[in-house]
């Protein structure tokens, strides 16, 4: 199918999942995962009305973003190294993959230098997979107050990467667990966290049924990435 057909199919699946869950389809944002994809495809998606894109690597984003329409919005969804924080804070409207207190502090430092406040999501490793990054639920709750106190960071919610499963229903308990963890975080902070970023091409409808507000879709939109561009399982969208 063409990109236009794929985009329509994904949007229809989002709407159907929202209806099953009794949710407004406008409460779910489609983030198009453009990692490994050329600027031409991003421009084609933009011409079809897609405006939010996600990248996994700062260097790739740094080269790609200037070649794309300026009205597009970009978020960082892959593992971020501390030495890339300066560029990440400059390039992205949100960093979804904050996985350690040290990284949060470095983002805060560069946001202060660049005179901006950086929205972030805290990445949670719910399945305890050694191949993936993220806070354990217990550590997240223990560190949450200190993370939220950083003056140039705004914690907007949580993100997770579910293990691959042939049947999406198998990861439903993890998505439900992230939603419940967000409620615990809100109780601890005494404030609402607007976002749950969870669900990729193979399981996003289940994620929506469990409360996702952002779904990260790559393959279902753009087709399989070239082999050289395929990221490891620890990366944040597909």
Regions found by a protein language model. Give the residues of each.
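Conserved alpha/beta-domain cores
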Residues: 1-202, 208-210, 222-224
């Amino acid at each position: 199918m063409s990109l236009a057909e794929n985009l329509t199919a994904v949007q229809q699946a989002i709407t159907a999942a929202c209806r099953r869950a009794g949710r407004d389809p406008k409460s779910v944002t489609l983030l198009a995962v453009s990692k490994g994809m050329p600027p031409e495809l991003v421009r084609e998606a933009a011409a079809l009305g897609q405006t939010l894109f996600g990248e996994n690597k700062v260097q790739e984003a740094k080269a790609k973003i200037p070649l794309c329409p300026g009205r597009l919005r970009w978020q960082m969804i892959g593992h971020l190294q501390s030495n890339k924080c300066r560029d990440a804070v400059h390039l992205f409207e949100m960093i979804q993959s904050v996985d350690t207190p040290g990284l949060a502090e470095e983002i805060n430092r560069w946001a202060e230098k660049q005179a901006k406040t950086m929205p972030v999501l805290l990445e949670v490793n719910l399945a305890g997979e050694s191949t993936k990054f993220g806070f354990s639920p217990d550590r997240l709750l223990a560190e949450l107050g200190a993370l939220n106190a950083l003056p140039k960071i705004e914690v907007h919610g949580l993100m997770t990467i579910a293990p691959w499963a042939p049947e999406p229903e198998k990861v439903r308990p993890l998505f439900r667990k992230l939603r419940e963890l967000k409620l615990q975080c809100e109780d601890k902070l005494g404030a609402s966290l607007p976002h749950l970023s969870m669900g990729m091409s193979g399981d996003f409808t289940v994620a929506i049924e469990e409360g996702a507000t952002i779904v990260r879709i790559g393959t279902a939109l753009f087709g399989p990435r070239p082999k050289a561009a395929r990221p490891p399982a620890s990366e944040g969208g597909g």
